[in-house]
């Protein structure tokens, strides 16, 4: 027997066909969220306050400093926040110190900074009672980038861009004449030498000394002549720069100096962030640039004079290892230049310079200039960075250095929750800083306290805006646990500061070789977002700079064996190494079986000898994301179908009684465990008590843990989230062990569907075009039954005419409609309701007409209640019937927080039990989707020789053209597993081979071709050919026919065109479009067409009259003019065209305006009759009133 047994949790054992030993556990799958948020609480917040503070007033008398902050206990628990539609957040308190420099007085105070949303243990936020996820963003990393292009003369031109995290861009470029130019913040270009002069290096000779002899530089200096001899070269340069940045303003050297300082050298306005400084230092340091170059000078130890590398040496890895410690020294090959006093910065500039030979003209010496040793704390650019990047730019023309690929994952980084929050918080704090400064100058300095200076409104508003309306703060996809998990691991290139759908080209969306082990090449949406929204690969982690790292096993340089030492590499580090594939055959001691192996180097797949190897992949599944790793036989599926398979697993509806797949990949347990939906034991211990609602575990230190299970909770997607215990009394549990299954889980594993018996055969054309033929057994035995919970709410508000009232006394409603309401008018739990039934009885006061003086007097005397009310009850919408599961009532008296003007709110939960039916969408894990076309009685389905009827019939035509052969392999292996009574695991790219599959088939005593004779259930005759029959995992998806079925007779109309609205949500009609009109014209159905275009659409008068005629039983009158035609006429008239409409006799037809005179819309006779009746009724009431009054008060006579 091939394969070996592996335990997944304590409740499931699978036969695994994996050949490769797992050397590394998968990381916690939601740590990208939790780690990032934890960093924000621990460091990010403090960093923010340190950046903004201290705040000084304009005169320099007061200064406000940050001391410390703390988060207090949250007001609500997670569950309470859900119930009360509140935020799960904690109050943030900041300790501030105000120093008065005039008196030396110091005041410290604790200031409340608003409520800060907290992350739940599941990696989500509760905002206004709804669970939200902050999606991580993929953005271009700050740093220095070099690019090349080919101009119209077929010459290669180079460009350089220094991109900060925030601040002005700096760009270098050359023109057709090879003159080098600089652009500051996308303005007009100036010669490069002008910028160097402005930094305080005025003469041509100084510039040549610094940057070295270069053709392009010489041409640039020739162009840059001294125009105004009254100014020094530096002053003239400063004025030139100012003129480009602020055209039209009077230019002086001083204003230019302060402007340049503010643009680039002021940490408050220009920020590279730690990642930008890291990238610039890495790109410009000589360590990376010397590799592969030929030295044009001898490098010696500055202390001993010992030669490290002689002239004409080519710097390879070994030479670099010897040089590296020296290159890290501050003074090794360091050159310091002192700028003139007129420059922007007075500080001297230190560079690291080494001479090498040009690649293009090998005898030409070139300076390699590094930016020296700049501290990681310096978050703005300094002159050394600018000079070193200019040098890199010039050296590119000599063939030294390399250009950058912007889609390389070494140049794209991830902004996770913590950083996104930090950026938002910074915006709020900087707005607050302005307010504080203004208040400092207004308030009395002797009595002012920190509390009086601080206005927290901008901070609170920016946080609220981020969680409520940012493109990256999303309503969590809660269809099933896999959907949740994937949503938390999603990477989006969209959002603020990112790309937009319309402008993103093909290159950005494409799979890049650096995605390997970092981002899944398969899981991405179909449609306009393809390639812009990705998923983190299963083993990938995000480092402190936001770059994605993936783990590799180190290969020993001496023995060339694979060690168990794991290194995490970013994409640009990986470019230096040769990496063997995970499935390279190994001996038990870690040595390679063969002398040559398949490996990767940059974007090449190469066959190489083992002495060239540096690393080896950790696992075959490190390439793909979690959802993709759940597809067995992925290697046998076409990638387009695998993409659909991965995406559709997220849409599987949690079933009432799910089963884990017989053919899994071993990923099901980990996905369920980390999704946050299973209940995990927080401490080890022994189970003392279990029921459906609570589990009690006695810890080893004798204290008791009580776990409450989630019962029938509505998820964000309206699915039923319910937990079931899987431990028994007396069981011992470990820390982090699953003690209760969540939705779509079974025995601690992900269970998105069922394992039905499936045959690939046609059946009376019912499975044409991917349709699915189902056996009635699946309906009867509730295999694909799911529970859906919908929430409806009704609010009683204060109106101008008085408060609304929730009551059972509803006008014009019979007792029959009120049978399920209690005495307050609220539906009882357990009642069965259907469309249109009342859930909450509510009446709203009607507008009263203006009363005459006499009537007002009568009102004042008798205080009688003639105020009318109208029925505004909450009713069950179309298709929303079911059983009332729960009713929640919120009132002010009970201490619930309600929005202003609301006196009472009632929330009703309706549960529907949906069996699978014709029209529902189903799918396997290989992108094999279809809709149910017929449900066949069990006895009519084809059956196997042992009499077992098949559950599902799929069309065999769906396999060859789609190239998802994985489903056929799964079918055979699934059948073998079912017959053997086992579960199997076949991990992606390392699963069951052909031989394993057929061995299992033989072991299960199945026919050697895996096929079976099938008999027709209706006639008992065998079908002609043998049919592939087996077990395949099949899911019911969230696209259910119940949610889509819709019909309308009358309903709402659009305001302008008066045509019916569209769509189920608006209760709209079906669009009868241009082509449908042609069809009826061609058929000659003139009357049908006429009524579709008039009565049934937008002939306002016609539809009212038609209704009257139908009610009275009269013939239907002729249609009038459609409203949309009137709109068209009005539009033409608005263009100044005098358009008239003529009839057949050339007489003008009057087009009335809707608002002028609506006589013909409403029946005038009926209206006058109604008015007369009302008047008579009123007179009668007044007479009765007068009579009653005289009866009570005889003296009135």
Curated annotation (Swiss-Prot):
Its EC number is 2.7.7.6. Coiled coil: none annotated. Gene3D superfamilies: 2.40.50.100, 2.40.50.150, 3.90.1100.10, DNA-directed RNA polymerase, beta subunit, external 1 domain, DNA-directed RNA polymerase, subunit 2, domain 6, RNA polymerase alpha subunit dimerisation domain, RNA polymerase Rpb2, domain 2. Residues 1172-1197 are annotated as: Disordered. GO terms for molecular function: DNA binding; DNA-directed RNA polymerase activity; ribonucleoside binding. GO terms for cellular component: DNA-directed RNA polymerase complex. Residues 1186-1197 have a biased composition (Low complexity). The keyword Nucleotidyltransferase applies. Keywords: DNA-directed RNA polymerase, Nucleotidyltransferase, Transcription, Transferase. InterPro entries: DNA-dir_RNA_pol_bsu_ext_1_sf (IPR042107), DNA-dir_RNA_pol_bsu_external_1 (IPR019462), DNA-dir_RNA_pol_su2 (IPR015712), DNA-dir_RNAP_su2_dom (IPR007120), DNA-dir_RNAP_su2_hyb_sf (IPR037033), RNA_pol_bsu_bac (IPR010243), RNA_pol_bsu_CS (IPR007121), RNA_pol_bsu_protrusion (IPR007644). GO terms for biological process: DNA-templated transcription. CDD domains: RNA_pol_B_RPB2. Residues 1172-1185 have a biased composition (Basic and acidic residues). It catalyses: RNA(n) + a ribonucleoside 5'-triphosphate = RNA(n+1) + diphosphate. NCBIfam families: PRK00405.1 (NF001616), rpoB (TIGR02013). DNA-dependent RNA polymerase catalyzes the transcription of DNA into RNA using the four ribonucleoside triphosphates as substrates. Belongs to the RNA polymerase beta chain family. The RNAP catalytic core consists of 2 alpha, 1 beta, 1 beta' and 1 omega subunit. When a sigma factor is associated with the core the holoenzyme is formed, which can initiate transcription. This is DNA-directed RNA polymerase subunit beta. The gene is rpoB.
């Amino acid at each position: 027997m091939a394969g070996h047994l592996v335990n997944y949790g304590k409740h499931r054992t699978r036969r695994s066909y994996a050949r490769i030993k797992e050397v590394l556990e998968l990381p916690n799958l939601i740590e990208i969220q939790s780690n990032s948020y934890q960093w924000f609480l621990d460091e990010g917040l403090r960093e923010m306050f340190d950046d903004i503070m201290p705040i000084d007033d304009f005169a320099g008398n007061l200064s406000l400093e940050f001391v410390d902050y703390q988060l207090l206990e949250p007001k609500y628990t997670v569950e309470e926040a859900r119930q009360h539609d509140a935020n799960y957040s904690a109050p943030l308190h900041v300790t501030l110190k105000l120093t008065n420099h005039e008196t030396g007085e110091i005041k410290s105070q604790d200031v409340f900074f608003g409520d800060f949303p907290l992350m739940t243990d599941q990696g989500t936020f509760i905002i206004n009672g709804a669970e939200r996820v902050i999606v991580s963003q993929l953005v271009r990393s700050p740093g220095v980038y070099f690019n090349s292009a080919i101009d119209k003369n077929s010459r290669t031109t180079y460009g350089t861009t220094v991109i900060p995290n925030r601040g002005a861009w700096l760009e270098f470029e050359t023109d057709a004449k090879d003159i080098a130019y600089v652009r500051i913040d996308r303005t007009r270009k100036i010669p490069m030498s002008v910028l160097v002069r402005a930094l305080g290096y005025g003469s041509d000779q100084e510039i040549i000394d610094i940057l070295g002899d270069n053709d392009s530089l010489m041409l640039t200096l020739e162009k840059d002549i001294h125009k105004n001899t009254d100014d020094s070269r530096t002053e003239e340069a400063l004025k030139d720069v100012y003129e480009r940045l602020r055209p039209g303003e009077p230019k002086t050297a001083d204003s230019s100096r302060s402007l340049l300082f503010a643009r680039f050298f002021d940490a408050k306005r220009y920020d590279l962030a730690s990642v930008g400084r890291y990238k610039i230092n890495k790109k410009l340091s000589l360590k990376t640039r010397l590799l592969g170059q030929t030295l044009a000078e001898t490098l010696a130890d500055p202390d001993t004079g010992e030669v490290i590398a002689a002239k004409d040496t080519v710097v390879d890895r070994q030479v670099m290892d010897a040089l590296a410690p020296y290159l890290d020294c501050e003074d090794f090959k360091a050159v310091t230049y002192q700028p003139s006093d007129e420059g922007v910065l007075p500080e001297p500039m230190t560079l690291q310079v080494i001479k090498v030979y040009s690649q293009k003209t090998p005898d030409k010496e070139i300076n390699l200039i590094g930016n020296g040793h700049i501290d990681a704390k310096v978050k703005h650019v300094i002159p050394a960075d600018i000079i070193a990047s200019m040098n890199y730019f010039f050296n590119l023309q000599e063939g030294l250095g390399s250009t950058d690929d912007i889609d390389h994952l070494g140049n794209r980084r991830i902004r996770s929750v913590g950083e996104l929050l930090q950026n938002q918080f910074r915006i709020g704090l900087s707005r607050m800083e302005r307010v504080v400064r203004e208040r400092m100058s207004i308030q009395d300095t002797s009595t002012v306290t920190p509390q009086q200076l601080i206005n927290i409104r901008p901070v609170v508003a920016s946080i609220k805006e981020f969680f409520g309306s940012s493109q990256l703060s999303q309503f969590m996809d809660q269809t099933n646990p896999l959907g949740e998990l994937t949503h938390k691991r999603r990477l989006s290139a969209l959002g603020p500061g990112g790309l937009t759908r319309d402008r993103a080209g093909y290159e950005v969306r494409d799979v890049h070789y650096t995605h390997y082990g970092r981002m899944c090449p398969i899981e991405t949406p179909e449609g306009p977002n393809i390639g812009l929204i990705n998923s983190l690969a299963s083993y990938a982690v995000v480092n402190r700079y936001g770059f994605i790292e993936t783990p590799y096993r180190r290969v020993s340089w001496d023995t060339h064996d694979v060690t168990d030492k794991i290194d995490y590499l970013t994409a640009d580090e990986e470019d230096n190494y040769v990496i063997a594939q995970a499935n390279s055959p190994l001996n038990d001691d870690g040595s390679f079986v063969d002398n040559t192996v398949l490996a990767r180097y940059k974007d090449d797949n190469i066959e190489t000898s083992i002495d060239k190897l540096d690393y080896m992949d950790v696992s075959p599944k490190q390439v793909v994301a979690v959802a993709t790793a759940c597809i067995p036989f992925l290697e046998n599926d076409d990638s387009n179908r695998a993409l659909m398979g991965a995406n559709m697993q997220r849409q599987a509806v949690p079933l009432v009684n799910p089963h884990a797949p017989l053919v899994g990949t071993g990923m099901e347990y980990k996905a369920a465990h980390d999704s946050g939906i299973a209940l995990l034991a927080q401490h080890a211990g022994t189970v003392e008590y279990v029921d459906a609602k609570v589990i009690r575990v006695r810890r080893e230190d004798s204290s008791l843990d009580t776990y409450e299970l989630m019962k029938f909770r509505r998820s964000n997607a309206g699915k039923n989230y319910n937990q079931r215990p899987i431990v028994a009394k007396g069981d011992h549990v470990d820390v982090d062990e699953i003690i209760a299954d969540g939705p779509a889980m079974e025995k601690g594993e992900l269970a998105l569907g069922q394992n039905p018996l499936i045959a690939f055969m046609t059946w009376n054309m019912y499975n044409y075009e991917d349709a699915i033929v189902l056996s009635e057994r699946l309906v009867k035995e509730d295999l694909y039954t799911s529970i859906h919970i919908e929430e409806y709410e009704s609010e009683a508000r204060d109106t101008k005419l008085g408060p609304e009232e929730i009551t059972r006394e509803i006008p014009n409603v019979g007792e029959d409609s009120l049978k399920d309401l209690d005495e307050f008018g609220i539906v009882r739990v357990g009642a069965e309701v259907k469309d249109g039934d009342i859930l909450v009885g509510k009446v709203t006061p009607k507008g009263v007409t203006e009363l005459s003086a006499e009537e007002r007097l009568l009102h004042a005397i008798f205080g009688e209640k003639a105020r009318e009310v109208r029925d505004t009850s909450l009713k069950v919408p179309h298709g929303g019937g079911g059983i009332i599961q729960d009713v929640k009532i919120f009132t002010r008296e009970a201490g619930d927080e309600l929005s202003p003007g609301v006196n009472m709110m009632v929330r009703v939960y309706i549960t529907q039990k949906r069996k699978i039916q014709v029209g529902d969408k189903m799918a396997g894990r290989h992108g094999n989707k279809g809709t149910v076309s017929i449900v066949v009685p069990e006895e009519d389905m084809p059956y196997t020789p042992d009499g077992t009827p098949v559950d599902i019939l799929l069309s065999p035509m769906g396999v060859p053209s789609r190239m998802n052969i994985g489903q056929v392999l799964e079918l055979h292996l699934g059948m073998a597993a079912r017959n053997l009574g086992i579960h199997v695991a076949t991990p992606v790219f390392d699963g069951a081979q052909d031989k394993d599959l057929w061995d299992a088939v033989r072991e299960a005593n199945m026919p050697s071709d895996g096929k079976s004779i099938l008999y027709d259930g209706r006639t008992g005759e065998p079908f002609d050919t043998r049919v592939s029959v087996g077990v395949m995992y099949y899911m019911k998806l969230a696209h259910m026919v119940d949610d889509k079925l819709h019909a309308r007779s009358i309903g709402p109309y659009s305001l302008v065109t008066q045509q019916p609205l569209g769509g189920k949500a608006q209760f709209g009609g079906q669009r009868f479009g241009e082509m449908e009109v042609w069809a009826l014209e061609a058929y000659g159905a003139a009357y049908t067409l006429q009524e579709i275009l008039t009565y049934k659409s937008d002939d306002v008068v016609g539809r009212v009259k038609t209704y009257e005629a139908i009610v009275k039983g009269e013939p239907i009158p002729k249609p009038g003019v459609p409203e949309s035609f009137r709109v068209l006429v009005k539009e033409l008239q608005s263009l100044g065209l005098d358009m008239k409409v003529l009839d057949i006799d050339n007489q003008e037809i009057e087009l009335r305006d809707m608002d002028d005179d609506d006589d013909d819309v409403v029946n005038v006779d009926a209206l006058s009759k109604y008015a007369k009746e009302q008047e008579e009724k009123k007179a009668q009431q007044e007479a009765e009133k007068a009579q009653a009054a005289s009866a009570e008060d005889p003296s009135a006579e």
